[in-house]
Amino acid sequence: PQYQKSCRLIPQHFREVCIRPGMRHGHYEGWEPAEIRCFFESAVGDGYPPIRITDVSLDDSLRVSFRTGIFPYSAEFYYTNDTLSDNAHRVWHTVGGTLNREKGTFTAPLPQEGFRFGFVTLKDVRLMSVSTEFISPE
């Protein structure tokens, strides 16, 4: 999708993605997430950086590797087969998985019905979120 192309214009060492299904759209709402400040303070100040996703692999399950110096709190795999709705109205489903904090991995089963697009969101103990770029089995 075009969103992915835009994300990849940012150099890898600065690229942080935070996808929020159901987030309202607008100038005020766009600056509402605390992740924006967290990223900015870690990039140019002395703030603690968000979780860093280091690898995504997809075979018989989905596996995301990450590194962080702060306690990873939760992770979910969001997916959709909805290709007709615009982003504001797209229907997303979630799948839980296994978050291995010591190894820095999250593993989730693939949905039985398949999926067209998906992403994983990881949250740290501060509830700061970071997402993978869009994942597609194609």
Each language-model region and where it sits:
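Beta-strand-rich binding/interaction modules
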Residues: 73-82, 86, 117-120
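Short alpha-helix in the alpha/beta-hydrolase fold that links the catalytic acid
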Residues: 1-8, 80
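Surface beta-strand/loop "capping" patches
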Residues: 31-34, 38-79, 94-111
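Conserved strand-to-loop "acid loop" that flanks and positions the catalytic carboxylate
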Residues: 1, 21-22, 67-68
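Catalytic histidine neighborhood in serine/cysteine hydrolases
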Residues: 10-27
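Short, aromatic- and glycine-rich surface loops/edge beta-strands on solvent-exposed regions
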Residues: 113-126
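Short beta-strand elements
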Residues: 126-138
